[in-house]
C-alpha cells in the first residue's frame, strides 16, 4: 500500500524525494511475490500514464542501480524481473493488465466495450513508449531495440495494423539515438522495409499516412542539425516553405538588380 501511494505521488518535480522513499521500502522487501507485484504496478502505471513514461523508465533504472535487496535474492533480481515482464508485455498482443481485465467486459454494451478497447490500445501504446524510454536511458541495448523493431515488422505485419502504429510510436521516440548507434545498413534496411509496406495494397490510407511520418523523419535529417532538438514535421514543412520563399525572393531580386547594373 505504501509503495502504491508513493507511486501515485510521483511527479517530475518530486522525483528525487519520492524515488528515494520507494527505494528505502524496496530494500526491506523479503518476499518475491511482493517484489513481483510492485514491478507489475510500475509497469501498469507507465502504460496508463504514457505521457510520463520517461519518468517511470528513470525510476526503474534508479531502483535497479541503487536498491540493496535482502541477500536472500539473487543479484540484480529487480532488473531481471522488470525486463522479463517488459518483454512479455511487448511481445504479447496485449499487456497483462488488459488480459486480466478483458474477461470482465463480457456484458458491456457496444459503447462501453469500445471505451475499454480504446483503453487497451492506449495501454499497449504506453508500454511501447516505456520500452522506447528504457532504450533512450541505456537500460536496453541497440541489439534488443532492433529485435523490438523487427518484431513488429516481421512477426506482426499485416496481421494487425495497430502494430504498425506501435512501431511508429517506438521509432519516432528513439529515432535520433537509433540513427547514431545502429549500423547504416540496418537503417537503410529499415526505411526500405517501411517504403515497401507503404507501397503494398493491403494497408488502409490511414496507416499509410502514419508510416509516411517515418519516411519524412528519415528525409528530414538533411534539414535538422545534429545539435538541435528533433523538429516536428509540421515545423520542418514550415521551414521548407520559408526557405523556398526566401530563395524565390532572392532570385527575383537578383534579376531586377542585374537590370539596373
Model-derived features with residue positions:
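Alpha-helical interaction scaffolds
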Residues: 1-261
Amino acid at each position: 500500500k505504501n509503495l502504491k501511494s508513493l507511486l501515485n505521488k510521483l511527479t517530475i518535480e518530486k522525483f528525487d524525494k519520492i524515488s528515494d522513499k520507494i527505494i528505502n521500502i524496496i530494500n526491506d522487501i523479503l518476499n518475491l511475490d511482493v517484489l513481483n507485484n510492485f514491478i507489475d504496478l510500475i509497469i501498469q502505471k507507465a502504460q496508463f500514464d504514457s505521457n510520463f513514461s520517461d519518468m517511470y523508465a528513470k525510476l526503474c533504472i534508479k531502483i535497479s542501480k541503487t536498491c540493496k535487496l535482502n541477500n536472500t535474492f539473487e543479484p540484480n533480481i529487480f532488473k531481471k524481473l522488470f525486463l522479463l515482464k517488459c518483454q512479455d508485455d511487448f511481445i504479447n498482443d496485449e499487456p497483462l493488465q488488459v488480459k486480466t481485465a478483458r474477461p470482465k467486459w463480457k456484458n458491456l454494451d457496444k459503447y462501453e466495450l469500445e471505451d475499454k478497447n480504446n483503453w487497451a490500445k492506449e495501454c499497449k501504446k504506453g508500454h511501447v513508449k516505456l520500452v522506447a524510454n528504457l532504450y533512450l536511458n541505456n537500460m536496453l541495448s541497440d541489439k534488443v531495440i532492433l529485435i523490438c523493431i523487427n518484431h513488429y515488422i516481421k512477426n506482426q505485419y499485416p496481421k494487425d495494423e495497430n502494430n504498425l502504429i506501435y512501431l511508429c510510436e517506438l521509432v519516432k521516440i528513439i529515432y535520433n539515438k537509433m540513427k547514431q548507434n545502429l549500423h547504416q545498413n540496418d537503417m537503410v534496411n529499415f526505411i526500405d522495409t517501411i517504403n515497401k509496406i507503404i507501397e503494398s495494397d493491403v494497408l488502409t490510407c490511414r496507416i499509410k499516412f502514419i508510416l509516411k511520418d517515418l519516411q519524412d523523419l528519415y528525409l528530414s535529417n538533411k534539414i535538422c542539425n545534429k545539435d538541435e532538438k528533433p523538429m516536428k514535421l509540421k515545423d520542418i514543412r514550415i521551414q521548407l516553405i520559408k526557405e523556398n520563399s526566401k530563395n524565390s525572393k532572392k532570385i527575383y531580386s537578383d534579376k531586377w538588380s542585374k537590370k539596373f547594373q
